[in-house]
């Protein structure tokens, strides 16, 4: 069952690339995204507060949260969220949907890139990735690879590729964010280049 929480805030950032879109709240939580297209099943549907399961979101949380700020990087569609803890620690979360030239064509995959970076102190973060399927009614089956995990949705397989140790993501354990880290969420395919290069 879900734990009680404050009513949802509709002051949301939008990330997209004409193939993919997501709504991100002020605390760096993806609360809405339909997959694999805009008219698809909302794997991230926390905006509607589904009651059947505690899921439908993709959050990057800082322990001892104190405050946050959110804005777009100048002249870009890159959403920057800074999370502060009450001990002087801070992290930056950059969210964007990539769009680039590939084989002489503009490539805009169904994909979200999340780049995490420590800014100050010794911030401890927790990643919670809990997609749902069938319009929030069911928890999808999960399968684990060497540096990725995938969820079997109704019409599509969702894959997270990351340089964060997978047990920390799978078990939602807090960890010290002491270096830049990358989370790439998209189709169940191998990335065309290295994770760090792809996340830039």
Task: Go through each PLM region and give its residues.
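Beta-sandwich/jelly-roll carbohydrate-recognition scaffolds of carbohydrate-active enzymes
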Residues: 2-200
């Amino acid at each position: 069952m879900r734990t009680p929480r404050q009513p949802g805030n509709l002051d949301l950032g939008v990330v997209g690339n004409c193939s993919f879109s997501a709504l991100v709240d002020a605390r760096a939580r993806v609360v809405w995204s339909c997959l694999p297209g805009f008219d698809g099943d909302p794997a991230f549907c926390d905006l509607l507060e589904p009651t059947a399961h505690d899921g439908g979101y993709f959050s990057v949380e800082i322990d001892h949260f104190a405050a946050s700020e959110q804005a777009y990087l100048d002249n870009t569609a890159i959403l920057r969220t800074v999370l502060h803890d009450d001990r002087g620690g801070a992290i930056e979360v950059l969210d964007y949907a990539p769009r680039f030239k590939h084989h002489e064509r503009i490539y805009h995959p169904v994909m979200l890139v999340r780049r995490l970076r420590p800014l100050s102190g010794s911030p401890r973060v927790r990643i919670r990735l809990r997609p749902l399927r069938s319009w929030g009614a069911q928890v999808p089956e999960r399968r684990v690879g060497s540096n990725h995990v995938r969820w079997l949705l109704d019409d599509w397989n969702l894959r997270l590729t990351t340089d964060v140790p997978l047990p920390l993501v799978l078990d939602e354990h807090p960890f010290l964010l002491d270096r830049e880290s990358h989370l790439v969420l998209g189709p169940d395919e191998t990335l065309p280049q290295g994770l760090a290069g792809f996340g830039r």
